[in-house]
Amino acid sequence: MIPKDINDSHIEQAAKEIDLNGVPSQRESRKYLVQVGENSYPPKYIISLAVKYLKGQELDSLDFIASEAKACLQKLGYEIVTK
């Protein structure tokens, strides 16, 4: 489950980490991307990393589904785009 207190700062920190390290092939999105600034990221992966900045540990991708990630990101004002 995605923590309810996740915020823009956590998402932006996760985006910076992805910019530095890339996206592991097994964490690529099949259908959707989230727009953060000028770049797009896999919604589930960015949420997993963002939780690390909130709770200190990455959220396992098996602990939530893609629609939860999309809803959380949209609630924070991010645009979800089809790949």
Roles of regions detected by a PLM:
Residues M1-K83:
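Terminal leader/tail segments of proteins
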